[in-house]
Each structure stands twice: as structure tokens, then as C-alpha cells.
Amino acid sequence: MLERRFLGSGGTGRSVGIIRQLYPTPETTQMVLRSLAIFERFGESVGGESGFVRSGVLIGVGAAMRPALEKTLALQRGLGVSAEILDPRDLGRVEPRIDPAGLGAVLYEPGSGYGDPSAVTAGYADAARLRGVAIEQGVEVTA
């Protein structure tokens, strides 16, 4: 494997590591659900640590976006997405520090969270090396 700079020097190194479930397309949702299962058992399936913390994820939308959010969630639940739409008045039971003023709905994904992008990168790199992959860093591909 060739890396122009060093592993994690691109977008991965600047990622906040949010791991969530609901996306607008079934294909993306299926991919992230598989990924979530890997992050939950990263040590067993890949090796190393992912730093995954199941903190839950909240996504607030205005009133005009609520119907689209409800439609997307209804379609994605059949794929295994674990989420619910909260009325802004009920947000306090999940996160009392957020002011719900101006929100039309809040998507709550209790099984989602965040991971450590650097640890995940290192885990996959180590797993690749154990399987015979040579990782060359500081190499630019020109053709």
C-alpha cells in the first residue's frame, strides 16, 4: 500500500470520528451498520482498539425538515437502524443541556457514538501488515 505522506495524514486525521446509523440511502446505511458492528468488536475482528464509545447521537432539524426525517427513518428502520424521533420538548430526557428552541424534531440514535480515527487507522494498518501487506509511507504515485 502506498501513502503519499503518512497514515492518517488526510481526512482521517482530521475526522471527529462520529459513528452514526441513519443516512439518506439504503446502501450507505447498510455499509455503516456493518461498520458499526466492526467498531463494537474491533479488537476481535481487526485487532487493536477503535476507541468506540456508545454515547448516542442527536441530530436536530427545523420543523420543515421533520417530514423528510420521518420518511427516511421509516425506510431505514427495516435495515436495522435503531433510532427514534423526539419531540423537541422531550429532548431534556436525553440531554438536558440543549435548548430545544427552534427545533422541529430531534433524531436520537442511542446506539451510535464516536471512535478514535488514529487508533482505527493503526489497527487496520497492523492487521494488514500481519497479513503480508507492505505499507510504504512518503511515496507519491505519479502514473
Regions found by a protein language model. Give the residues of each.
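Glycine-rich FAD pyrophosphate-binding loop
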Residues: 1-13
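Short beta-to-alpha linker loops that shape the active-site pocket of alpha/beta-hydrolase fold enzymes
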Residues: 5-7, 91, 124
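Conserved active-site and cofactor/substrate-binding residues in soluble primary-metabolism enzymes
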Residues: 14, 30, 34, 86, ...
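Dinucleotide-binding Rossmann-like beta1-alpha1 core, especially the glycine-rich loop
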Residues: 17-94, 103
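Flexible glycine-/small-residue-enriched beta->alpha junction loops
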Residues: 99
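Short loop/edge segments at beta-strand edges and connector loops
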Residues: 3, 87-88, 137-139
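Alpha-helix N-cap/helix-start motif
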Residues: 9-12, 69, 117
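Helical element adjacent to the flavin cofactor pocket in flavoenzyme catalytic cores
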Residues: 107-143
